[in-house]
Amino acid sequence: FKDNEIGEIETANYDTEYLDEIIDRVYEYYTSRTTHHDWKPLDLKHCRKWVWKIFNDDDGFFDPKNRTVVEAEPHFDFEVDEEWAEYSYTLDDGTVLEGKLALKGTIDLITDVGDGVYEIIDWKTGRRLDWATGKEKTMAKLQKDPQLRMYHLACKKLYPDVETFLVTIHFMNDGGPFTLHFQDSDIPETLQMIRAKFETIKDTNFPQ
């Protein structure tokens, strides 16, 4: 297929040198657009290592070449259609800002695992920690993880006909993959979590 940014890609070509070339081209594309960072040769080395780790770990189970890919890096941007998501702020100059809470982001990969089930896959290169508490993220904590739940909510917007989603967060350097199951009945709790955070932010007077 033809990528919008780096051109033609031979999806059936698994040659090591060719795949390294693709990694290099993608690395060049992103680093050339992130000029505020001082990129070092070690950064490219790490990127290559992590990509090949995805290809090889678990006998290639999470290698996208072995999956039925629905979409790579889908972007989501949608308003939360709830009354509580409305906001209105008056700025110092008298300007009134009104609207609704919007959620936006990018998901690493969506795959079709069959029987009407899609899998949302998100890779992490860092540690499996809750940075707010410094404690390790367990399966129970991941079930309540706002990011993963927001990904599920976003995918219901992107793929409304799909009822069941698996969400896999893959800590490639700290514990491997953790897969959770989300369905439509989980959405009310997800919206309540988002509402609680949104209202906390709305009620914050300093800083504004």
What residue spans do the PLM features occupy?
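A non-catalytic, helix-rich entry segment at domain boundaries
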Residues: F1-S88
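Metal-dependent nuclease catalytic regions and adjoining charged, substrate-binding loops involved
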Residues: E10, D115, A140-D145, M150-Q208
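Short coil/turn segments at secondary-structure junctions
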Residues: T35-D38, L42, D93, K135, ...
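Short helix-to-loop capping/linker segments positioned immediately adjacent to catalytic or ligand/cofactor-binding
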Residues: D38-W39, D59-F62, V96-E98, K135-M139, ...
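Short, structured helix-loop boundary elements
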Residues: L44, R48, K100, P188-L191
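A general secondary-structure signal for short beta-strands and their flanking turns/coil
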Residues: R67-V69, K100, K104, T164
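A structural signal for short, well-ordered beta-strand segments
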Residues: A72-P74, L109, V167
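Non-catalytic protein-protein interaction segments used by genome-maintenance enzymes to assemble
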Residues: D77-L148, H152-C155
